[in-house]
């Protein structure tokens, strides 16, 4: 999520000087999507940022925020936004208390780690939450810069918002899996002359036929 959002902001004219990436996969994505950025520890990125994007799993967000606040890594006036769907700005309270302007900016889409993420991000809705109209204006501007559509979500409704998206997504995944299985069965058998064989490889014939209908 982080490298995709960073690349989208960079395309909009922001300078992404640094990223924090721990896993080999995330470091590789950062190197490809943000080749001019330095990979640094989170505290160093935070200390030098005017806009700090926290794109970590929901279960790790509170710990990261607490650590950054304890280390005094975020300067007053820094815009800090997280990409979690389940959390509003309450989880960022330790940084708000230190003078940061905090936002929740959640892209409502599934990330695959592939190039298509960037294209889909430009057409995604973003659930945004802020403390006041100034915060909402900044969040909306950031989302629009990335090509997305900002949608306001009240702080007290973030849990319901996330649950609704997860519920819908899980059912859609089940439906798509079932549809792919049925389509593969319908297309299997002796191959027609010149037609690609039907298999379960990613981006196979069944996936390509279903994609325009499911998107």
Which stretches of residues belong to each language-model region?
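NAD(P)+-binding Rossmann beta1-loop-alpha1 motif at the extreme N-terminus of oxidoreductases
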Residues: 1-47
């Amino acid at each position: 999520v982080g490298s995709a959002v960073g690349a989208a902001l960079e395309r909009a004219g922001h300078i992404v000087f640094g990223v924090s990436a721990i896993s080999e996969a995330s470091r590789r994505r950062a190197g490809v999507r943000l080749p001019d950025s330095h990979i640094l520890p989170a505290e160093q990125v935070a200390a030098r940022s005017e806009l700090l994007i926290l794109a970590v799993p929901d279960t790790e967000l509170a710990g990261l925020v607490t650590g950054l606040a304890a280390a005094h890594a975020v300067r007053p006036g820094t815009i800090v936004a997280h990409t979690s769907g389940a959390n509003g700005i309450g989880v960022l309270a330790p940084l708000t208390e230190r003078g940061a302007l905090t936002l929740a900016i959640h892209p409502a889409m599934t990330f695959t780690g592939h190039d298509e993420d960037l294209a889909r991000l430009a057409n995604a809705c973003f659930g945004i939450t802020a403390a006041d109209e100034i915060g909402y204006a900044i969040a909306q501007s950031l989302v629009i810069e990335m090509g997305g559509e900002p949608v306001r979500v009240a702080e007290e409704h973030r849990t319901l918002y996330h649950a609704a998206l997860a519920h819908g997504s899980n059912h859609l995944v089940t439906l798509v899996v079932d549809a792919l299985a049925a389509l593969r069965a319908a297309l299997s058998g002796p191959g027609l002359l010149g037609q690609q064989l039907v298999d379960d490889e990613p981006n196979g014939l069944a996936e390509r036929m279903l994609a325009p209908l499911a998107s």
